[in-house]
């Protein structure tokens, strides 16, 4: 640590504390402000757009300083946290009246992007995720927690950086911790990440934190169930949270393992290509996600992150959707749900000590809705709905307690009192009555003093510095009684105190302090009582979230004309009248649906041709989106859907340069294609759009043909859009390949897209007509037409050899020299025979 002896005692104290929190901003409490110094001040001034000032000197230079008011700090902290930065809150813990030197201060809380619980810091519709990555022997062990949900999830061991990246980005965490400094430095996730000290990833420490943090039975089960490296990863989260909270994270009550074989996997590029859950208005989530509660919105996002292939779970969801859809029963349920607040996060704030009085009012009001909700659910007496209803706890005792204890519109904090209802605590009421009745005393006291000394202008008042006083004009100085003691001199008047008024002041101020202390004690006791219901409220919140999502699915099914999908084990994907929801939502004219059939018995690969804007990409995307919706338990945009087991969806759609990594468009395309080829299986759905565009015609055609053949050979369900008409010949070579195309009609030099998939190969690309629609000038179009005519004429002259060269990509006959060389057996030939052959070849 640097020499700080030349600084003032206060700055010395600051630097000592700051040395323990070098990588985060230190909010240092000074009176009614949080102050920041040195580099922290510069950074805060820039981030928060606040004034940068100075205080004192350091090495002859002014010390930068910036500050925010204590009462408004929450808004400033929220801005910092949302930028991915962390903050240490340093409070005054000593008594200024008894302190020698600077008032004692210590960090009471650390706020990081993933460990906040206050409403102002959180996105209500998104989980706050903390990910821990333990790297060991080229393997990645990953665990994560949704902080306010009170659970830790363990993910399967990952064996590649690409697999790790996909897993992390799918979770979209607010914060990542790791033992790998190299990984933190590279940060392939582009998320807030920090490398922690080694002890956080010590197996010994991990087991200690598991035992200290979790219920004994849960801890024993975890220690027996998981391997050491998995325990290390779980323990790293618990130790990190303990350090952040300055307390044991007792709100963590569950550890679970995510079974990959139960989920439909979609890599991050495919998620982006399919516009599943980004923030745009055209995303699938924006169309499907109309939940009434924050609880439901977050659960739906979890469904989007981990679509399930468990058919029992899907059957349960579909059964509930059907039940809630009968007579639009979901409308009554959604009406009740709209009055329910985020009780999951409220009870977490209670456990973490960050709850506000208004949260308790919101909790009470939400719990009051539960009897109504339970009654509505009981009207649909199915086993699936009854199971959810049984996990919604009707907490009447807690409702009564909160109703009696907290006023209807409490202040923001308990700090200044005024939270506890009159009649809840007799002692508090008595203390408050002293202050409340003080006005009557002062009126009577003032009137008595006026009569006593005969001065009608006498008045009794109060200020925070000098307390209660009797004020008289200086012209009445000769009438001042001897019992009046001067308290303050003003320009035109004097202020006095009497023994009676001083006794009253002591009583009132004492009662106010005692009332605040009593109210704080009652409030803390109330929170301890509320936390006894923690597990019941968490279970209730989870059940409300589930019924909210399924009621939302029921409403969407009717509103968007969705149908219930079927599942088969026949390796067949049969879809009728499929629609693309986002496009249908955003166009005025009717959307034209299409059928899709993929089957091991007929075709697993469709070569799709047709003009740009004809509907090829929409057709492929809508199939992938339909499969995705089926596996989150929603109904689907088709009149009929019979779906087989799909374990992964891969897409290769569009591309652009990756300038930051020095990769061209073609390199990006080939990298993504290689990933799909190396990982796809017979249970995959593969979407390939225009492979080979970024290179020469022959190279592109060769690569596209090879890729298509590979998918045909592996039997993956593949939709393969291309402008290489030569690929349509594959249907003659492979029985599981078929051609479909999207038609267009020409009329008077104009093109009209039918958007309908038709069996067979397209005969034209209509590129010039599409260029006309795009606004290309007429002279360029005429030149293009002439060029096209010349090229087609040339093509006709050499069609047989040209097509053969493009399509076969190898010589039709072998060179005689090559034949002779291939016939030589180098394992049996003698040196003399080799020389004779060489002599013979040279003569040729």
Curated annotation (Swiss-Prot):
Listed GO MF terms: ATP binding; ATP-dependent DNA damage sensor activity; damaged DNA binding; mismatched DNA binding
GO annotation (BP), single: mismatch repair
Binding site for ATP: 610-617
InterPro entries: DNA_mismatch_repair_MutS (IPR005748), DNA_mismatch_repair_MutS-lik_N (IPR007695), DNA_mismatch_repair_MutS/MSH (IPR017261), DNA_mismatch_repair_MutS_C (IPR000432), DNA_mismatch_repair_MutS_clamp (IPR007861), DNA_mismatch_repair_MutS_core (IPR007696), DNA_mismatch_repair_MutS_N (IPR016151), DNA_mismatch_repair_MutS_sf (IPR036187)
CC per GO annotation: cytosol
Key words of the record: ATP-binding, DNA damage, DNA repair, DNA-binding, Nucleotide-binding
SUPFAM superfamilies: DNA repair protein MutS, domain I, DNA repair protein MutS, domain II, DNA repair protein MutS, domain III, P-loop containing nucleoside triphosphate hydrolases
Coiled-coil parts of chain: none
Pfam families named among the record's database cross-references: MutS_I, MutS_II, MutS_III, MutS_IV, MutS_V
Gene3D superfamilies cross-referenced by the UniProt entry: 1.10.1420.10, DNA repair protein MutS, domain I (3.40.1170.10), MutS, connector domain (3.30.420.110), P-loop containing nucleotide triphosphate hydrolases (3.40.50.300)
Biological role: This protein is involved in the repair of mismatches in DNA. It is possible that it carries out the mismatch recognition step. This protein has a weak ATPase activity.
Family: Belongs to the DNA mismatch repair MutS family.
Entry protein name: DNA mismatch repair protein MutS
